[in-house]
Design a protein with these regions (language model features):
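Short conserved segments within the C-terminal catalytic ATPase subdomain
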Residues: 2-10
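Conserved short strand/loop->alpha-helix "switch" segment adjacent to the catalytic nucleotide/phosphoryl-transfer site
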Residues: 11-30
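Conserved ATP-binding N-box helix of the HATPase_c
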Residues: 24-46
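Short beta-strand/loop element within the Bergerat-fold HATPase_c
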Residues: 49-59
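Glycine-rich/acidic phosphate-handling loop/turn and adjacent ATP-lid/helix
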Residues: 59-90
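Glycine-rich nucleotide-binding loop
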Residues: 71, 108-115
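Detector for a conserved hydrophobic position within an alpha-helical segment of the HATPase_c
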Residues: 96-97
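Glycine-rich ATP-binding loops of the HATPase_c
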Residues: 100-110
Length: 124
């Protein structure tokens, strides 16, 4: 999909499938919505890049998605989860919170990053 829109995709996965605390359903909700939002945000950006990282860090499962975006098109909102993508990010937040996790949204200049951190049930 990224190739279709001329977006450079950088991925890093540093874990085994046994280290993913989410169900397949919830993982699909999180990654699907974050990736869909990233592609949408990159549509009108030249040399767009999407970075996706999945890894375990200090007994947490971390999902990190960063993408280029046109900062001048940012809509103001009191709630970052309502920013541009509405239900998609709400669904991400709801899925992550089911596992006692949380999301950090960090829009800066021309990069938009979402980090989801979910505690692991056991020490790895």
């Amino acid at each position: 999909m990224a190739d279709k829109y001329h977006i450079t995709l950088d991925t890093s996965i540093k874990l085994s499938t046994t280290q993913i605390p989410l169900t397949d359903y919830d993982l699909t909700i999180v990654l699907g919505n974050l990736f869909d939002n990233a592609i949408t945000a990159c549509n009108d950006v030249e040399n767009a890049v999407i970075t996706v990282k999945l890894q375990t860090i200090r007994n947490t499962f971390t999902i990190y998605v960063e993408n280029s975006y046109n900062a001048s098109k940012k809509h103001s909102s009191d709630n970052d989860f309502d920013f541009i993508h509405g239900y998609g990010l709400k669904n991400v937040k709801n899925s992550v919170e089911k596992y006692n996790g949380f999301c950090i949204i960090d829009p800066q200049n021309c990069l938009y990053a979402v980090t989801c951190i979910i505690p692991l049930n056991q020490i790895i």
